[in-house]
Amino acid sequence: MKFSAYLWWLFLNLALVKGTSLLSNVTLAEDSFWEHFQAYTNTKHLNQEWITSEAVNNEGSKIYGAQWRLSQGRLQGSAWDKGIAVRTGNAAAMIGHLLETPINVSETDTLVVQYEIKLDNSLTCGGAFIKLMSGFMNVEALKHYAPDTEGVELVFGPDYCAPEINGVQFAINKVDKITHESKLRYLQEMPLSKLTDTSQSHLYTLIIDESAQSFQILIDGKTVMVREHIEDKKKVNFEPPITPPLMIPDVSVAKPHDWDDRIRIPDPEAVKLSDRDERDPLMIPHPDGTEPPEWNSSIPEYILDPNAQKPSWWKELEHGEWIPPMIKNPLCTAERGCGQQIPGLINNAKYKGPGELNEIINPNYMGEWHPPEIENPLYYEEQHPLRIENVISGVILEFWSGSPNMLISNIYVGKNVTEAQIIGNKTWLMRDRAFRGSDGPTERKFMNSRLGNLQTTFHNERESPNPFDRIIDRILEQPLKFVLTAAVVLLTTSVLCCVVFT
């Protein structure tokens, strides 16, 4: 048992070593951003680059009460298992970073946003949104960030709040060409978030193809939503809509007085029963209800308290005449009974209820009335609905922290799908395989982007020229075979040694 445990420990450590070496082999474009959090030694060092907001509300309390820390994750020593963790649950969380090289997305570019999330505790309500910001020039802008801060160009990430919400949010900022008002437009249809899964980490990817005006959402490298030709507003629903409606109702027109929109009406030929009196009550006093012999209705049930004293602070000029409180009349005992005696009620035999007539379908029904439509004076045609109109200068994580110790890592923002694929393959996929201890066809494949027909996967990447890396690759491809082979070799060696030395 100890021997097999040792072999499995050796396999995991080989995976960690391989993952560490893979990170150093990734080369990105100059305007690509990848935060794997390897450069930070502790939380204090992290806070020099990743800034939390110090904004306060009207009461003087900090808006974002959640605290962050640098976390190593589950596999200690793993270079690709490091990230930042929200230490506080049930609090507003925010942390941001300024990009050294701002990202300018042109009409022909492809924008990719990708990051990894791992929950350690169960979640009932919370999110994990990433926001791309424009106009952030210095650290002070991050320190003063508030929910109403302008410059949010894009929102992406999982959101869960049982039972109403469970999906991946996507919103893009667009400026109305008529009113010049800037608003985030939220996608109304959302794929399931998988945010409640605490068993493993999940990788969230957004790919926007500016030239095709299409977008794709992936979870763990698998496409969960693809929407093409966003300029066709009938296919994709954003709220508020990216393109205003061409026709709108004419609010100046009122419904005609003779418009009959009643679906059913009382039958005009039905005859109401002549013996029906709608004034008859449902219940009547019992006809045999008489006072018991010992009952005395002349004695009041309640009297003024003769022993009550007017309070010393009572002033009749201010409070009016003082009246003692009422008490139960001591002369009215349970045996005798006093006051007005109310007889019991019984059902009225004459009651027949209101005379409801039968209904028929209205022969004059004209349907539901709608005002006529007119051309929208604020209409304009949006040629590039998914265009990021401003230069991206900062990345912010902002959400309601519903789960303490939630780990976020491997944040990528760039214009290259292949870069995101390689990062996902060399980080999330490597760790996922180590956790699962398997390497089937499903685990090997990562992304298959319909936007560009790229099919780069972990399996078909070029092999490393390093012999040590190639040996580890073979071990990782078939870990069970490696464990069994090593066990047989060690057992055979032990037997031979015993034979030789005896």
From Swiss-Prot:
One GO CC term, this protein: endoplasmic reticulum membrane
Enumerate the Pfam families for this protein: Calreticulin (PF00262)
Hey, which stretches end up on the Lumenal side? Answer: 20-481
- Example of a GO biological process term: ERAD pathway
Q: Where is this region: 4 X approximate repeats?
A: 250-316, 320-377
Give the UniProt subcellular location, in the record's own words: Endoplasmic reticulum membrane
What's the protein here called?
A: Calnexin homolog
Q: What gene name does this entry carry?
A: CNE1
